[in-house]
Amino acid sequence: MAAFLRCPLLARHPPLARAFATGARCPFMGFAHRAAPELQEDVERPQIPAVEVLEELLRDGGAALNRTVRDCMDEDAFPYEEQFQAQLGALRRTHTYRVVTAVGRRADAPPLGTRGTAPHTSVELWCSSDYLGLSRHPAVLRAARAALDAHGLGAGGTRNIGGTSPLHGALERALALLHRQPRAALFSSCFAANDTALDTLARILPGCQVYSDAGNHASMIQGIRRRGVPKFIFRHNDPHHLEQLLGRSPPGVPKIVAFESLHSMDGSIAPLEELCDVAHAYGALTFVDEVHAVGLYGARGAGIAERDGVQHKVDVVSGTLGKALGAVGGYIAGSEALVDAVRSLGPGFIFTTALPPQRGGGALAALQVVGSAEGAALRRAHQRHAKHLRVLLRDRGLPALPSHIVPVRWDAEANTRLSRALLEEHGLYVQAINHPTVPRGQELLLRIAPTPHHSPPMLENLADKLSECWGAVGLPREDPPGPSCSSCHRPLHLSLLSPLERDQFGVRGAAAG
């Protein structure tokens, strides 16, 4: 009855009987009259503990879990399930089917984690992209908790509709300053940042051509493909091939040259200045993905461009909050007009919920750590441990590539077998990297990511156990180990260990250096 009395139409009809009669003919009030008590705002909701609700959902959902997409269709409909199973079968036959390993990272004891019911309930994590361990840094956690208490769990909307907090603006300004660019824009992930920025730029630049490195990440490839513009693939990190391709384009045509400063899988570092100089000589914008370099290179942790002193030659830089900075999210930085255009016209920025404020608070604190003396010390320790591990692996005749990401390359089947053996037999979690993350034929046995929190004994143990599993699987070794990588022929820089580092790492590291 209270609902009827609040209706502006029925308020003009005081007699209750007449009000009910009118309400029966009103579509809105008729619905209110028939509504169940649970839908009425003045009915108290039962207080059921969230755990009991979840248990009830899981208990009652068993039947629904067994349904297929064909259950509500005629027999002559397309065989959807069979097609799905055929695709999955092909992955299993080529040893590229993805099995997710559930590991709970321990914030109190990096780089350890837990596996629950597995034989080794405690595991060492060797494939995390939390390169510096900042996701559990006390200052980062305090800032994230403070933002959570102040603003709640979610952003509450898109950036344009109620989802922009003061923390979003502060983080964008800090990221722009980090890369010495006028402006930055945050995205839900760096996949979204690359995809949206490249797609939007290709759309708004008339007749745009895109020149893409052959090793680019899937997010860049998707953004380039989405618009269907003319695209040209240059050999990985090859400025001479890039120049050959650019030389065929008319000078007045807008062009974008897109590449990664540090390759996400093999860890190779691009000749950044040379690529930028070639691009600018032919009037092309440079779009540089610094995802795996931010926080790890440069005096302030801005990446390879800062390390090489060429930040001014990068027109658009993309980065992530989710690796060395220990948070979640992505961003681009560039000129005021360029970033504003992507922000104003990019669907991946406009039509998605903004990053939660606590992510911004935590990321701001992580940036402060990265730019401090502590951050510089973490970067030194990170690089030192990567060098040490390469020494140990090469000593054992294992084909390690030269990078802070230490990939050990072999075929897909061996990838899976060795990764499983390391985890199940020794409690060492190193993920095999297979197609489509890398092209067929370029599968990486292990993508090892040592951190400052892996101790020298941990590095020794990993090398010993990997060597043991390598022999058990029957894989050949490189004997004697050469001074350069057998895959890319780049020097391994084993001699870069300082006397202090050699003393710390013992006889093996010193002898190999």
Swiss-Prot record:
Swiss-Prot/TrEMBL catalytic activity: succinyl-CoA + glycine + H(+) = 5-aminolevulinate + CO2 + CoA
Cysteines engaged in disulfide bonds, as pairs: none
Primary site of residence: mitochondrion
Pathway annotation from the record: Porphyrin-containing compound metabolism; protoporphyrin-IX biosynthesis; 5-aminolevulinate from glycine: step 1/1
Keyword presence, Hydrolase: no
Catalytic site: 323
GO cellular component terms listed in the entry, alphabetical order: cytosol; mitochondrial inner membrane; mitochondrial matrix; mitochondrion
Single annotated GO MF: pyridoxal phosphate binding
PTM-bearing positions, type N6-(pyridoxal phosphate)lysine: 323
Subunit comment: Homodimer.
PANTHER family assigned to the protein according to its UniProt record, in alphabetical order: 5-AMINOLEVULINATE SYNTHASE, ERYTHROID-SPECIFIC, MITOCHONDRIAL (PTHR13693:SF58), CLASS II AMINOTRANSFERASE/8-AMINO-7-OXONONANOATE SYNTHASE (PTHR13693)
Name of the protein in its database record: 5-aminolevulinate synthase, erythroid-specific, mitochondrial
Organism, as annotated: Gallus gallus (Chicken)
Gene name as annotated: ALAS2
